[in-house]
Amino acid sequence: MKTFTLIAILTCAVFVIFHAAAAEELEAQDVIETEALATLDEERLFECSFSCDIKKNGKPCKGSGEKKCSGGWRCKMNFCVKV
């Protein structure tokens, strides 16, 4: 009976250790993905600002000195789009 109890306790301990390790790994992956998304968003903002500086159909997408598109223009997929 003592052997069975010892085996059960050791099995539970191993299960808890593996579960904790898996949880840490998933948490680490979540943090990495979040950082990657933040970087991607910053890159998109930069690309959007850059593309809106380009003139489309002879008209600027945004006024000089403005940080956002105006005059009915919006940045979509790195292009100036008339709304």
UniProtKB/Swiss-Prot annotation:
Keywords: Disulfide bond, Ion channel impairing toxin, Knottin, Secreted, Signal, Toxin. Residues 24-44 form a propeptide. GO terms for molecular function: ion channel regulator activity; toxin activity. Disulfide bonds join C48-C61, C52-C75, C69-C80. GO terms for cellular component: extracellular region. It is found in: Secreted. Expressed by the venom gland. Residues 1-23 form the signal peptide. Belongs to the neurotoxin 12 (Hwtx-2) family. 03 (juruin) subfamily. Probable ion channel inhibitor. This is U3-theraphotoxin-Cg1a. It comes from Chilobrachys guangxiensis.
